[in-house]
Amino acid sequence: MAAVRHLCQRTAIRLRLTCSPQSRVCVVRGHRLGPFDDEQYRKTSVSIMQKEASAGTVIYSYSPRGFNINGNTVFGPCAVLPPAILQWNVGSHSDISVESLSLFYLLEPQIEVLVLGTGARTERLHAEVLEELKKRGIAVEVQDTPNACATFNFLSSEKRLAAAALIPPPAGSR
């Protein structure tokens, strides 16, 4: 009984013990004032991507594993749509299609420039992809990923309506 009281005092539980005289079983009823460890995992958490809304999105670095954008690590290919950063489901430049870029068509206000980073080298895109972007009034810059990151940072610093679709360069390509 002393152990139960000690445990309850540590976890800030108020107790009302009811014991029957015929048995050694006690019913413990109480109210918790603080969360237990297992309740911490059920809570929703929010990561603040940037402290100020006007600061803009900046790509600080890239690696074969992903990117450091506004101090946050993003693994794998990503779509940078200020102020959001999303995983982009492509494996290489050959996977870039009209469907894989459909996310960029839905943005309001419409982006002016889409910067595509194709990995270690500048790669050619399928003609229908370029035609679709032109038809929708979106200028496209296809570059190797290091230059695409720099171009996006420049456009972002000028407050242009730009987005980036980036594929990390493979290991050993720097």
Swiss-Prot record:
What family is this?
Answer: Belongs to the NDUFAF3 family.
Q: Which SUPFAM superfamilies match?
A: MTH938-like
Q: Which Pfam families match?
A: DUF498
Tell me the InterPro entries matching this sequence: MTH938-like_sf, NDUF3, NDUFAF3/AAMDC
- Protein location: Nucleus; Mitochondrion inner membrane
Which species is this record about?
A: Danio rerio
Q: Which UniProt keywords apply?
A: Membrane, Mitochondrion, Mitochondrion inner membrane, Nucleus
Query: From what superkingdom does this record's organism come?
Result: Eukaryota
Q: List the GO cellular component terms.
A: mitochondrial inner membrane; nucleus
Asked if the Swiss-Prot or TrEMBL record annotates the protein with the keyword Magnesium, the reply is: no
Gene Ontology BP terms? mitochondrial respiratory chain complex I assembly
Entry protein name: NADH dehydrogenase [ubiquinone] 1 alpha subcomplex assembly factor 3
Provide the function of this protein: Essential factor for the assembly of mitochondrial NADH:ubiquinone oxidoreductase complex (complex I).
Name of the gene this protein is made from: ndufaf3
